Curated annotation (Swiss-Prot):
Gene coding for it: xni
Protein name: Flap endonuclease Xni
Annotated PANTHER family: 5'-3' EXONUCLEASE FAMILY PROTEIN, FLAP ENDONUCLEASE XNI
Organism (species): Aeromonas salmonicida (strain A449)
Cofactor: Mg(2+); K(+)
Molecular function per GO: 5'-3' exonuclease activity; 5'-flap endonuclease activity; DNA binding; magnesium ion binding; potassium ion binding
Binding residues for Mg(2+): 111
Keyword annotations from UniProtKB, A to Z: DNA-binding, Endonuclease, Hydrolase, Magnesium, Metal-binding, Nuclease, Potassium
Length: 265
């Protein structure tokens, strides 16, 4: 059965680089050390995951559709260090050195590309493993899709979602629609925090059911808040939901692992 390993490239690289940058190295030395650690990490992932296909997905220099509909999207995030951004080509080469192809789009966010890749292979009954610390991918969890937090050595699975949020993976988008995601500067419903969001979704099941309930005369205080800020909740829902239908322009044969000899490609 095919097993696709998807590496959230910048999520991995930025954390590896941050460790080196704390070692009082020069920027050039930190980049060299990051490259060496990236190769070592990549080889560990390939050995441990035993994939039949693999790809590393990068964010490009894009002005995403989310920024178009919500200009404050991701405002306030710490920018990538200049020396790291300027050295991304050599880090991309490090993936290729390990036999891992890289995907970089100038029109789509890496998160949406990863969601499309994982969902596409899952629809055909095959498996996908996403390497990332980004909990946003937990909305994709199903028997065919798993998420591995390499740095904390844990699986971000349904049990993790239940423990962390008190909901099932299919409810996460609606959970974040209510609470917002501070790391992406996405606002939810003022006055509805994680505990209340969990209680509401455990009782009503979904945001659509909550929106129907909040129109009732006997609506509770949290539901009245939702009624007042329902447009914000719907916008947040749209922003946090990953796209799963982006045209990719390549097929699985092109990202086989180990790579096919050029004569067979």
């Amino acid at each position: 059965m095919p097993h696709l390993l998807i590496i959230d490239a910048l999520n991995l690289i930025r954390r590896l680089h941050a460790v080196q940058a704390q070692q009082a190295l020069t920027p050039a030395q930190a980049l060299i050390a990051t490259r060496a650690n990236l190769i070592n990490t990549c080889r560990k992932l390939l050995t441990g995951s035993e994939p039949t296909h693999v790809i590393a997905v990068f964010d490009g220099e894009i002005h995403s559709w989310r920024k178009e509909v919500y200009p404050a999207y991701k405002e306030g995030r710490t920018p990538m260090p200049v020396e790291l951004r300027e050295g991304l080509n050599t880090l991309q080469d490090a993936f290729w050195e390990c036999g891992v192809d890289a995907l970089l789009s100038q029109t789509d966010e890496a998160d949406d590309l990863i969601a499309t890749l994982a969902s596409g292979i899952a629809q055909h009954g095959a498996r996908a493993t996403i390497i990332s610390t980004d909990k946003g991918f937990c909305q994709l969890i199903c028997p065919q899709i798993q998420i591995r937090d390499y740095f904390n050595k844990r699986w971000l699975d349904a049990a993790f979602v239940e423990q962390q949020y008190g909901v099932v993976p299919a409810q996460l988008v609606d959970f974040w629609a209510l609470t917002g995601i501070s790391g992406s500067n996405i606002k939810g419903v003022p006055g509805i925090g994680p505990k209340t969001a969990t209680q509401l979704l455990q009782q009503y099941g979904s945001l659509s059911a909550l929106l129907a309930a909040c129109q009732q005369e006997e609506a509770s205080k949290p539901l009245l808040k939702l009624r007042q800020y329902q447009d914000d909740a719907l916008l947040a829902q749209r922003l946090v939901r990953l796209q799963r239908d982006i045209p990719l322009g390549f097929n699985l044969r092109e990202i086989r692992y180990p790579p096919a000899p050029e004569s067979e490609a």
